[in-house]
Amino acid sequence: AGEYSLSQITMDDVDLTRKLKDTKLRVKAYYAYDSVSQCVLGASYSRDKDQNLVKECFRDMFRLIAKHGWGIPAGIEVENHLMSEYKYTLLQEGTVFSYVRYCAPLNSQEKQAENINGAKKRRIIHRNHVGIGRFYGKWKYRVESKKISDAGNDTWEDKQYYSFDELVADDRRDNYEWN
């Protein structure tokens, strides 16, 4: 982690907690956080976890940095699986960032962004939206849902579903409140 704000950023993907009306799936989000202040510097949203999601997050972050006239952070911490395409371009040390740290594959807890995602969920998202949690959760993190018997045996029916635009707008408001 850096010592000063905007000295290092950390990036991670997350599935939004509520589901879409049309597909009953979750919207994928990608965030860029400042490691020191933990502010969201960039966010992007998609129905699929792919390279466009990553590129749009970088664009959103760089637009914010340029808009305010801030300098480019010295370091970045990223995961392997979605960032390997940029290893010899954008994420080559010295190209944009002085220091690039790739976290170990299959070790998601290593990234600082994972902890920030969890803190934001506990402090903001649970408070702002009803019905968020797991059927096996404890206390306020437990939700009631209806089990659907099917071939996969892992389907649960939620009480309410949302449009893509509603979910993105709600998440952007949550990010604004988090910052």
Residue ranges of predicted features:
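Mobile-element integrase/transposase regions
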Residues: A1-Y31, C39, N52-C57, R63-L64, ...
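Short, well-ordered alpha-helical packing segments
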Residues: V27-Y30, G42-A43, K55-R63, E77, ...
